[in-house]
UniProtKB/Swiss-Prot annotation:
Keywords: Cell cycle, Cell division, Periplasm, Signal. Transmembrane segments: none annotated. The gene is tolB. Its main location: periplasm. The Tol-Pal system is composed of five core proteins: the inner membrane proteins TolA, TolQ and TolR, the periplasmic protein TolB and the outer membrane protein Pal. They form a network linking the inner and outer membranes and the peptidoglycan layer. Belongs to the TolB family. PANTHER family: PROTEIN TOLB, PROTEIN TOLB HOMOLOG. GO terms for cellular component: periplasmic space. The keyword Cell inner membrane does not apply. It is found in: Periplasm. This is Tol-Pal system protein TolB. GO terms for biological process: cell division; protein import.
Length: 430
């Protein structure tokens, strides 16, 4: 926990002021069919009101995963603070087989102890499936809640939790000196801060695999340029600023390379930079347009969008040579893919019959499932555990962020209050 807090603290060193206009998750579909679970408000052992609702954070995280449906607080049969106080029959009568309880205790030095227990209501009374405690300062109470959520989620599903991750996105506001902002927030929209403000468009943020940097496209020099910004100190490295288009950056999973698209020779083609030496290699060639690269887990293979067959489709190619292979065949066109961290599936923008939605394709069987039902969906980005996708869509005269689970059951919206939100990128584990 201490190491995790040190890593996360680096994000706050540069931005002391957190924005007040934030995005918040609004669930639109899918919770009722999820697994029921009990999350009891954590007992506050100090004077006055609790500084943070840790139980509420855990319940929201589990609900936002799409896999759990926490029992409403008004229906809780009891409010125990420890496993020993849990009455299994009271919970099992409501179909609840697991309950999260906990306490928050203030320390004399101003810090807090946060403790939780995950209790099995189907076993002997007091049976604990998982438990932990953390000592944190006030600003890390939400992080402690997300940590508990990660551990509970993994214990119950066998899947690593992704509640301590962040999202990067571009916000376009109306007017002002800097109408374009690259922002980062917790995955649930809290703790939002500005990475970069610009009078010109910002596009295509992409995370480094260690979560310490963002690559993105800026037009501040009068033409497009690719840059990499270190989040802890704000240092910016220019990667490419060739004539015409520079765009679509993507870090390799091993962190040694950056793929991107350039049109300096005419058509859009893919290039890969060795980040240590700065050497750039051209990967694709020809008259077709090749763009939107995403890496397979081996850090040697790219999936990308190409119009070599007429309409945009997704292809894959080894960066060390060989012919590109088309991998999408359903729908009139497919583009802007994001490959899962295990390489078993990808999500993409799929168009058919005039509709443009987010779809998931199994990379073994080729099977395709349409996940979203919003309007003009684009720029999908997978959570690092592969359970959720964040993407942007059109709503009214603007754009908003949306979440959908990769099984298609759970859907949510992250509306912003101060502008159009687009180009989301989900961070790696932090």
């Amino acid at each position: 926990m201490k190491q995790a807090l040190r890593v996360a603290f680096g994000f706050l060193m540069l931005w002391a002021a957190v924005l007040h206009a934030e995005v918040r998750i609004e669930i639109t579909q899918g919770v009722d069919s999820a697994r029921p679970i009990g999350v009891v408000p954590f007992k506050w052992a100090g004077p006055g009101a609790a500084p943070e609702d840790i139980g509420g954070i855990v319940a929201a995280d589990l609900r936002n995963s799409g896999k759990f449906n926490p029992l409403d607080r008004s229906r809780l049969p009891q409010q125990p603070a420890t496993a020993q106080e849990v009455q299994p029959t009271a919970w099992s009568a409501l179909g609840i087989d697991a309950v999260v309880v906990g306490q928050v205790t203030p320390n004399p030095d101003g810090s807090y102890n946060v403790a939780y227990q995950l209790v099995d209501t189907g076993g002997a009374p007091g049976t604990v499936l998982a438990q932990n405690s953390y000592k944190v300062n006030k600003q890390w109470l939400r992080y402690a809640g997300h940590t508990a959520s990660d551990e509970v989620f993994e214990k119950l599903t066998g899947i690593k939790g992704a509640f301590r991750t962040r999202i990067a996105y571009v916000v376009q506001t109306n007017g002002g000196q800097f109408p374009y902002e690259l922002r980062v927030s917790d995955y649930d929209g809290y703790n939002q801060f500005v990475v970069h403000r610009s009078p010109q468009p910002l596009m295509s943020p992409a995370w480094s695999p260690d979560g310490s940097k963002l690559a993105y496209v800026t037009f501040e020099s009068g033409r497009s340029a690719l840059v990499i910004q270190t989040l802890a100190n704000g240092a910016v490295r220019q990667v490419a600023s060739f004539p015409r288009h520079n765009g679509a950056p993507a870090f390799s999973p091993d962190g040694t390379k950056l793929a991107f698209a350039l049109s300096k020779t005419g058509s859009l083609n893919l290039y890969v930079m060795d980040l240590a030496s700065g050497q750039i290699r051209q990967i694709t060639d020809g008259r077709s347009n090749n763009t939107e690269p995403t890496w397979f887990p081996d850090s040697q293979t790219l999936a990308f969008t190409s119009d070599q067959a007429g309409r945009p489709q997704v292809y894959k190619m080894n960066i060390n040579g060989g012919a590109a292979q088309r991998i999408t065949w359903e729908g009139s066109q497919n583009q802007d893919a994001d490959v899962s961290s295990d390489g078993k599936f990808m999500v993409m923008v799929s168009s058919n019959n005039g509709q443009q939605h987010i779809a998931k394709q199994d990379l073994v069987t080729g099977g395709v499932q349409v996940l979203s039902s919003t309007f003009l969906d684009e720029t999908p980005s997978l959570a690092p555990n592969g359970t959720m996708v964040i993407y942007s869509s059109s709503q009214g005269m603007g754009s908003v962020l949306n979440l959908v689970s990769t099984d298609g059951r759970f859907k949510a919206r992250l509306p912003a209050t101060d502008g159009q939100v687009k180009s989301p990128a989900w961070s790696p584990y932090l």
